[in-house]
Amino acid sequence: MRLTISRKFSLVFLTLILINLLVGGIGVLNMQHIIQKTDEINTKWIDGIKGITSINYVTEHLSSKEKDFLIYTDKSKMDTLDQEMNQIMEDINQKLDNYEKTISTDKEQKLFEQLQTKVNTYMDIHAQIIESGRTNDMDKARGLLVQTEASFEDMKKTITQLVDLNQEGSNTAVKETKAVYHKGLIYTALLVAASILISIFIWLYITRNIVKPIIRMKESANHIAEGDLSNDMEALNSKDELGDLNEALQKMVGNLRDIVGYSKDISSRVLSSSQVLATATNETRSGSKHITETMNEMAEGSEQQAQDAVTIAESMNEFTESIDKAYNHGITISDTSQNVLELAVSGNENMATSLQQMKTIHHIVEEAVHKVRSLEQHSQDINKLVQVINGIAEQTNLLSLNAAIEAARAGESGKGFAVVAEEVRKLADGVSDSVQDITRIVNGTQQEIHTVITYLESSFTEVEKGTENLTDTGQAMQHIKQSVTHVADSIKEVTDGLKQLTNQSITINQSIENIASVSEESAAGIEETFSITEQSAHSMDQVLLNAEELEQLANELNEKMGQFTI
């Protein structure tokens, strides 16, 4: 297959486009992976921490309600508390169901099953506490409360393990997100470096296979324009338009050598004939003896000269057509070079925009990591507050038990334990305040989560913009632009030289036509002189004038041919 210049440039830019598409595709895949990991953090690990923490809080609330249930003796109040505790148990079951949907590992599933078993055990003890409270069996109730405390502590251990597991998963997802980003950055840098190397290779290839041959042909054309035909053109082993142009120039030089050499020979012969004609004319004046022989020689010379002029004119027409063809090829190459230059400029602008957008993405991902770390600190604050609530709950438990025991022993006089009851209410208030603190911290955590989502959505938008712009060339386009500009200038010089050579060939054609015309006139004069012998004196004068004119034209032709060096 013939690999023309246009096909070469098409392959070059197709290669660059494929590299840019590869860079953009890797960038999009990496950003999709980052978005997936972010969704995993938000929808799985963070929701898991929130869900399991809320189970811990609701269970503590249920334990507090149990103690309140044993303190009161009013049936309506006990019914109200029982109804509230049933609602809390339904809430616990609902939260367990919701958390189960976020489980993704066997270890987490195993811990969840253990938690479910412990919750069921706690619920069974709870039912017995309610039954003992309604029957006013305080000894049994106290024993059951001790069991619930142990069961609750056991549940807390499992809950803590689940929280740690979710926190570990969140940290792992963050590390994987950063690894994906750094990996994508390395791949992008490698592909950009590869693009630069390929562009440099293309630039060297164009310089060697296109620019240098054009410079050599330009130098040869300059020699031809100066009339130097002695140098042989170096053969170009290329099957594209440059090869065709080089071959046409080689043929042109060969044809010019033949034409110039033949023209020099013809001009010398014409000059010699004109001198002979002048001598013959002078001799004819002194005697008519040699008129017939001289006229025959001149007639033969004029006929030969006319035939030679026709041959030269045909050769010059072929030479002019070859020059026109080479000139048209030069214009086509010049237009192609201009298109390549425009594409190189556009590629430089797009690559600069793409690099700026990748820097913006790097900044946004760093902000997202900081926000996730802040969320981790808030989770630790929640655990501290939960410990405070546990301490208050334990004190409340002891005071409520003491109040219940004393009231049972004192009977009617148990009303004097109002002080203990007041202390219980104060501790209950402390529990309420701690719960409010937990709520506020959880709300702050949710706000941080929304902030993380906003930053990551912003990074995704920037990646999309970067992908749209990463479809063209890299930084090495500037070198290609300079090379193509140099190629275009060189081609223009070649086409200008070809145009000048065309004008010179037209001038030579006109001179040859003048020679043919003079030859025909000379032949007509000779025939007229030969046929009209009685007017020989007058005819010889006319022939002498024609001979002088022919000699002048021959001298002019010799001067023209003298400009060429064979």
UniProtKB/Swiss-Prot annotation:
Summary of the function given for this chain in its UniProt record: Chemotactic-signal transducers respond to changes in the concentration of attractants and repellents in the environment, transduce a signal from the outside to the inside of the cell, and facilitate sensory adaptation through the variation of the level of methylation. Attractants increase the level of methylation while repellents decrease the level of methylation.
The family annotation for this protein states: Belongs to the methyl-accepting chemotaxis (MCP) protein family.
Keyword terms of this UniProt record: Cell membrane, Coiled coil, Membrane, Signal, Transducer, Transmembrane, Transmembrane helix
Gene that produces this protein? yvaQ
- TM helices/strands, residue ranges: 186-206
Q: What is the lineage of its organism?
A: Bacteria, Bacillati, Bacillota, Bacilli, Bacillales
In this chain the HAMP domain maps to: 208-261
Q: What topology in the membrane does the UniProt record assign?
A: Single-pass membrane protein
**A Pfam match:** MCPsignal
- Domain (Methyl-accepting transducer) spans 280-530
Q: Which domain of life is it from?
A: Bacteria
The cross-references to Gene3D superfamilies, in alphabetical order and at most eight, read: 6.10.340.10, Methyl-accepting chemotaxis protein
Tell me which positions the record assigns to the signal sequence: 1-31
Cellular component GO terms, alphabetical: plasma membrane
Which residues fall in a coiled-coil region? 74-110, 536-566
| Name this protein carries in UniProt | Putative sensory transducer protein YvaQ
Q: Which SUPFAM superfamilies match?
A: Methyl-accepting chemotaxis protein (MCP) signaling domain
